[in-house]
């Protein structure tokens, strides 16, 4: 699927806040959206090639802030770290908030695309990692900026306040709370409506999926540290092997969903990282598991 086709289904419906009498105005928001698609595609590719890790989205935030200021938005940077808030006031009316993520993931891109990410950085633990936009946040940002352009260019068709939020550190589940603690809902306009989207491959290009009721899940991140007793790999009877315990724990965790949760209730438990040991003939003192848990109820 081409970047242009993907973007065509992800630019926010720009008919938000439209008054019925304004439909005769030219150009219409949808016409503006079509005009802005080439620029959206270009921005998407630019962002895709320059991803930044969670809480380090300095250049990404600056790029979005600059574009939004150029459109006439009042922009505040460094909200909750590297977050941004952009406001466009257009008379009396509801406050509508649109939100995008800013961060990328510590994964290596192997798509072979001409605009594939080749970025490598050191993470907070000092490890060198590849970085890529593997969760669509680059596309979400391009959609947000294009929507900002459409709404700024068609002010005669709507009334109210548009509030755009660039959320940092979404992947580490810390950016939203940081922005709230920094006064997102008290320093700025309090939204009447909050809208967000997520790109996916579950629908054909050109279609937008809308779900009534609950859709996405709550995400919790857990770390389990298993303490053992190190020793030589040739004498496991003198040690307490945390790797063996970790292996048993990983398998046991999967029985929570199948045996502890009521059938029909949604839960996913995934062990995404296993860290232990430094050499193949040494039993380490500990093993660390990194988990994500997804639920729809508390």
Question: Which sequence ranges carry the predicted segments?
Answer:
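A conserved active-site cap/scaffold subdomain adjacent to cofactor or substrate pockets
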Residues: 280-298
């Amino acid at each position: 699927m081409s970047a242009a086709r993907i973007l065509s289904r992800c630019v926010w419906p720009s008919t938000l806040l439209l008054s019925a009498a304004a439909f005769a105005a030219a150009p219409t928001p949808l016409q503006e959206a079509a005009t802005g698609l080439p620029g959206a595609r270009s921005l998407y590719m630019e962002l895709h090639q320059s991803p930044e890790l969670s809480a380090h989205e300095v250049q990404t935030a600056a790029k979005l802030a600059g574009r939004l200021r150029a459109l006439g938005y009042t922009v505040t940077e460094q909200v909750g770290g590297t977050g941004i808030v952009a406001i466009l006031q257009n008379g009396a009316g509801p406050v509508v908030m649109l939100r995008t993520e800013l961060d990328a993931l510590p994964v290596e891109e192997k798509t072979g695309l001409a605009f594939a990410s080749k970025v490598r950085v050191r993470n907070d633990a000092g490890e060198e990692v590849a970085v890529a936009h593997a969760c669509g946040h680059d596309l979400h940002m391009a959609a947000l900026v294009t929507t900002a352009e459409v709404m700024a260019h068609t002010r005669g068709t709507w009334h109210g306040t548009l509030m755009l939020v660039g959320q940092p550190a979404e992947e580490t589940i810390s950016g939203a709370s940081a922005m709230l603690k920094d006064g997102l809902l008290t320093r700025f306009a309090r939204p009447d409506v909050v809208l967000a989207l997520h790109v996916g491959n579950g629908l054909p290009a050109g279609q937008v999926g809308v779900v009534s009721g609950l859709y996405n899940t709550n995400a919790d991140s857990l770390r389990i540290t298993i303490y053992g007793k190190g020793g030589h790999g040739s004498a496991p009877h003198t040690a307490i092997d945390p790797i063996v315990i970790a292996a048993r724990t990983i398998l046991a965790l999967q029985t929570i969903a199948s045996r502890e949760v009521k059938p029909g209730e949604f839960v996913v438990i995934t062990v995404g990282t296993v860290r232990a040991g430094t050499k193949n003939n040494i039993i380490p003192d500990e093993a660390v598991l990194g988990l994500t848990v997804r639920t729809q109820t508390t």
